[in-house]
């Protein structure tokens, strides 16, 4: 949420002289650096492979491409956060980029949740109701769903654009800091409950229901021959659920506890410091979903592994035959036949 990185700081200055500034700066700069590198190269590679094998059209490919784009848009702003925390909370990039960097993190967070939920729902439909709803799981419908998710998240996340930069008492420009006035704090609390219900609880329940139905359906078909497909589906369920629990659940639970903690009358210095550290850890975990998503692509029922194999063969083939310019036309024709 707005200023989640340092939310407790302004509430503890009058009572607690200790701070977690050093801990915060070290953890955020380290975690965001790692997420930037791993997330950028992982999602760039996945996106490149998916685009290169776009002739293998499927609804799940559409969701995976959009998920990779959301991750890349986020990781491109994380280096700005790294610079901010390396310089001990000094912002050098202007008010617009301050707002945009905050906004990008939460757009990615909730786009990832909704794309994963949509993938889970349509996979459930494909496995549990393969005949009755065969026209529901199509690439065209997947595009409409993705456009709807982007529009919904972009609009509903717009309040995060209100998180502007400002000058502190030492004339340093600050960003990602907590709201100061009571009215804004109440607004943040309302925003939290809306995002908690619609951005986490409903999607999480949907995923659990879908995966329960998938598992029950697969268990009923244990005597059938498609054992490899069943193993791939269960593997995907485990990875998606684990990523959801590790990245999103700790952040939303901690945020709920944190906001109520801020409104309590009695807060010891130790409890304030512990709460501040929990903010740092859970927000870092939430941002790390950019690194987990490439694993989701890999475990999406073997589809991505097949694409990767196809991509590798095409790449090796092109490298082998590039010098033979006279043979380029028949080779291209052969590839078209294979596709």
Swiss-Prot record:
GO terms for biological process: calcium ion transport; cell surface receptor signaling pathway; cellular response to hypoxia; chemotaxis; establishment of localization in cell; inflammatory response to antigenic stimulus; neuropeptide signaling pathway; positive regulation of angiogenesis. The chain crosses the membrane at residues 31-51, 60-80, 109-129, 144-164, 196-216, 233-253, 279-299. It comes from the Eukaryota. The keyword Transmembrane applies. One of its GO terms (cellular component) is plasma membrane. The keyword Membrane applies. One of its GO terms (molecular function) is leukotriene receptor activity. Disulfide bonds join 98-175. Glycans are attached at residues 6, 171. Residues 52-59, 130-143, 217-232, 300-339 are cytoplasmic. It is a multi-pass membrane protein. Residues 1-30, 81-108, 165-195, 254-278 are extracellular. Pfam families: 7tm_1. Keywords: Cell membrane, Disulfide bond, G-protein coupled receptor, Glycoprotein, Membrane, Receptor, Transducer, Transmembrane, Transmembrane helix. It is found in: Cell membrane. Belongs to the G-protein coupled receptor 1 family. Receptor for cysteinyl leukotrienes mediating constriction of the microvascular smooth muscle during an inflammatory response. This response is mediated via a G-protein that activates a phosphatidylinositol-calcium second messenger system. This is Cysteinyl leukotriene receptor 1. It comes from Rattus norvegicus (Rat).
